[in-house]
Curated annotation (Swiss-Prot):
Belongs to the phosphoglycerate kinase family. One of its GO terms (molecular function) is phosphoglycerate kinase activity. GO terms for biological process: gluconeogenesis; glycolytic process. Pfam families: PGK (PF00162). GO terms for cellular component: cytosol. Pathway: Carbohydrate degradation; glycolysis; pyruvate from D-glyceraldehyde 3-phosphate: step 2/5. This is Phosphoglycerate kinase. Monomer. It catalyses: (2R)-3-phosphoglycerate + ATP = (2R)-3-phospho-glyceroyl phosphate + ADP. Keywords: ATP-binding, Cytoplasm, Glycolysis, Kinase, Nucleotide-binding, Transferase. The gene is pgk. It is found in: Cytoplasm.
Length: 398
């Protein structure tokens, strides 16, 4: 990576500002999934071990007005982080002011403080989300000239707590998580070991147009599954019953199929039901057509067998988006079959691009078998599109 990393700077005795992604799900004051906290630990521990004084910034959810603050405080996160680190985490419960400044100035080497939810600054004029220059400058002034960005999940956004701080410090560097995310995803797309197979699921073609176009020029094959497959199949003249379809994207689907010249792989059969919820009949289709009154909710046995054929010998696999409604046991066989086909390839570098695919791998017990699971859905999508991430671009060059 052509940017400075946390290992390139002297940290001892310095107040080090760190942007982490602690945007975790919280229900009734309890964190229900702490993966993002765990993912930030290597960078935090390194800073503390080097004698740095860590000042952490993170957002949590969306905050538009005063009433939104309820349930959006980072207090439960401070408690969880303290337990994971085995040391106190100072939490002044504010985003600015004399109390915060005093608490930061009182930190000793190896101590840590968490600033309150950065999006509390969005209540008055969206200062965080719109990268208000004064806010970025103020937050930068709380440290000693070093900013570590370890929040890959927000790297595709230009906010005061990443791009704003970066612009006002001597050195803005990448943390270990950000460095790994970029290394795995960008290198897989830009310099893959071949054969390189990309797998795209999810419901809408419109969400993935840029990704499909970029990957068609980079990958050896692009497997399409999930709801967006039905738009491609309808564009080819197949019957799709009551399946999800974007009729306004049929011409685009035809264009992409022509451009792909055989690189786009679509389902050969489907698992269908007579309703999305409350269905009374589930069956497999004989081919790519779906009968009237039925909707496709997963791929079926011929497609799963084809996944094994298409992925045979693959050395790089990037997967973004499930191929069925995996949350329902009736429609998870396709996603399970796909994961089986990926992880059994010898020496394969297998990468999941965050979001629902990551949830599928974790919930269905496959997470440990993949080379890398991204922590950022939106950011990984933009990398797969070949876009420049503002949070990364703002870091200091090596």
């Amino acid at each position: 990576m052509a940017k400075l990393t946390v290992k390139d700077v002297e940290l001892k005795g310095k107040k080090v500002l760190v942007r982490v992604d602690f945007n975790v799900p919280i229900k009734d004051g309890v964190i229900t999934n702490d993966n993002r906290i765990t993912a930030a630990l290597p960078t935090i521990k390194y800073i503390l071990e080097q004698g740095g004084r860590a000042v952490l910034f993170s957002h949590l959810g969306r905050v538009k007005e005063e009433a939104d603050k309820a349930g959006k405080s980072l207090a439960p996160v401070a408690k969880a982080l303290s337990e994971k680190l085995g040391q106190d985490v100072v939490f002044p419960g504010t985003t600015r002011g004399a109390e915060l400044e005093a608490a930061i100035n009182e930190l000793k080497d190896g101590e840590i403080l968490l600033v309150e939810n950065t999006r509390f600054e969005d209540i008055d004029g969206k200062k965080e989300s719109k990268n208000d220059p004064e806010l970025g400058k103020y937050w930068a002034s709380l440290g000693d000239g070093i900013f570590v960005n370890d929040a890959f999940g927000t790297a595709h956004r230009a906010h005061a707590s990443n791009v704003g701080i970066s612009a006002n410090v001597e050195k803005a560097v990448a943390g270990f998580l950000l460095e790994n995310e970029i290394a795995y995803i960008q290198e897989a797309v830009e310099a893959p070991e071949r054969p390189f197979v990309a797998i795209l699921g999810g419901s809408k073609v419109s969400d993935k147009i840029g990704v499909i176009e970029n990957l068609l020029s980079k990958a050896d094959k692009v497997i399409i599954g999930g709801g967006m497959a039905y738009t491609f199949l309808k564009a080819q003249g197949y019957e799709i019953g009551t399946s999800l379809v974007e009729d306004d994207k049929l011409d685009l689907a035809k264009e992409l199929l022509e451009k792909a010249a055989g690189k786009l792989i679509l389902p050969l059969d489907h698992k269908v039901a007579n309703a999305f919820a409350g269905y009374t009949e589930v069956k497999e289709t004989a081919d790519q057509n779906i009968p009237a009154g039925f909707m496709g909710l997963d791929v079926a046995s011929k497609t799963i067998a084809d996944y094994n054929t298409q992925l045979e010998g693959a050395k790089t696999v990037v997967w973004n988006g499930p191929v069925g409604v995996f949350e329902n046991p009736d429609f998870q066989a396709g996603t399970v079959g796909l994961m089986e086909a990926i992880v059994k390839q010898p020496g394969v570098k297998s990468i999941i691009g965050g979001g629902d695919s990551a949830a599928a791998a974790i919930n269905l017990g496959y997470a440990e078998k993949f080379s890398w699971i991204s922590t950022g859905g939106g950011a990984s999508m933009e990398l797969l599109e070949g876009k420049v991430l503002p949070g990364l671009a703002a870091l200091t060059e090596k």
